[in-house]
Protein backbone atom coordinates (compact mmCIF):
# COMPACT_ATOMS: atom_id res chain seq x y z
CA UNK A 1 0.00 0.00 0.00
CA UNK A 2 2.63 2.61 0.90
CA UNK A 3 4.51 1.79 -2.31
CA UNK A 4 1.28 2.33 -4.22
CA UNK A 5 0.95 5.77 -2.70
CA UNK A 6 4.57 6.43 -3.59
CA UNK A 7 4.09 5.45 -7.20
CA UNK A 8 0.89 7.44 -7.26
CA UNK A 9 2.70 10.61 -6.27
CA UNK A 10 5.37 10.03 -8.92
CA UNK A 11 2.63 9.35 -11.44
CA UNK A 12 1.03 12.60 -10.39
CA UNK A 13 4.30 14.37 -10.96
CA UNK A 14 4.51 12.83 -14.40
CA UNK A 15 0.95 13.70 -15.30
CA UNK A 16 1.22 17.30 -14.16
CA UNK A 17 1.97 18.02 -17.80
CA UNK A 18 -1.41 16.64 -18.84
CA UNK A 19 -3.41 17.85 -15.85
CA UNK A 20 -1.80 21.28 -15.84
CA UNK A 21 -3.49 21.73 -19.22
CA UNK A 22 -6.81 22.34 -17.52
CA UNK A 23 -5.19 24.21 -14.64
CA UNK A 24 -3.10 26.59 -16.70
CA UNK A 25 -5.56 26.74 -19.59
CA UNK A 26 -6.87 30.03 -18.22
CA UNK A 27 -3.47 31.63 -18.56
CA UNK A 28 -2.85 29.77 -21.78
CA UNK A 29 -6.01 30.86 -23.56
CA UNK A 30 -5.31 34.38 -22.39
CA UNK A 31 -1.97 34.21 -24.13
CA UNK A 32 -3.25 32.62 -27.34
CA UNK A 33 -6.31 34.87 -27.50
CA UNK A 34 -4.08 37.81 -28.25
CA UNK A 35 -2.23 36.05 -31.06
CA UNK A 36 -5.08 34.02 -32.57
CA UNK A 37 -8.71 34.34 -31.60
CA UNK A 38 -9.85 31.85 -34.23
CA UNK A 39 -8.40 28.88 -32.32
CA UNK A 40 -7.33 28.98 -28.69
CA UNK A 41 -4.65 26.34 -29.19
CA UNK A 42 -3.87 25.30 -32.74
CA UNK A 43 -1.49 22.51 -33.50
CA UNK A 44 1.15 22.91 -36.19
CA UNK A 45 -0.55 20.05 -38.03
CA UNK A 46 -3.85 21.92 -38.03
CA UNK A 47 -2.21 25.05 -39.34
CA UNK A 48 -0.53 23.12 -42.13
CA UNK A 49 -3.90 21.65 -43.09
CA UNK A 50 -5.56 25.07 -43.10
CA UNK A 51 -2.70 26.52 -45.11
CA UNK A 52 -2.97 23.69 -47.63
CA UNK A 53 -6.71 24.11 -47.98
CA UNK A 54 -6.26 27.83 -48.65
CA UNK A 55 -3.36 27.36 -51.03
CA UNK A 56 -0.83 28.97 -48.71
CA UNK A 57 2.67 27.60 -49.30
CA UNK A 58 4.01 25.79 -46.25
CA UNK A 59 7.60 25.85 -47.50
CA UNK A 60 9.66 28.97 -48.06
CA UNK A 61 13.23 29.02 -49.38
CA UNK A 62 13.29 25.24 -49.15
CA UNK A 63 12.49 25.18 -45.43
CA UNK A 64 9.26 24.79 -43.54
CA UNK A 65 7.58 27.86 -42.12
CA UNK A 66 7.43 28.15 -38.36
CA UNK A 67 4.15 27.93 -36.50
CA UNK A 68 3.95 31.68 -35.98
CA UNK A 69 4.76 32.41 -39.63
CA UNK A 70 2.05 30.01 -40.74
CA UNK A 71 -0.36 31.61 -38.31
CA UNK A 72 0.33 35.06 -39.73
CA UNK A 73 -0.23 33.86 -43.29
CA UNK A 74 -3.44 32.08 -42.36
CA UNK A 75 -4.73 35.20 -40.61
CA UNK A 76 -3.86 37.38 -43.58
CA UNK A 77 -5.65 35.09 -46.01
CA UNK A 78 -8.74 34.82 -43.79
From Swiss-Prot:
Cysteines paired by S-S bonds: none
One GO cellular component term: virion nucleoid
Compositionally skewed regions (Low complexity) per UniProt: 1-27
UniProt entry keywords in alphabetical sequence: DNA-binding, Early protein, Virion
Region (Disordered): 1-41
Keyword DNA-binding among UniProt keywords: yes
Keyword DNA-binding set for record: yes
Domain of life: Viruses
Expression induction: Expressed in the early phase of the viral replicative cycle.
Molecular function per GO: DNA binding
Places the protein is found: Virion
Role description: May play a role in genome packaging through direct interaction with viral DNA. Binds to ssDNA and dsDNA with the same apparent affinity in vitro.
Protein family (similarity comment): Belongs to the asfivirus P10 family.
Protein name: Structural DNA-binding protein p10
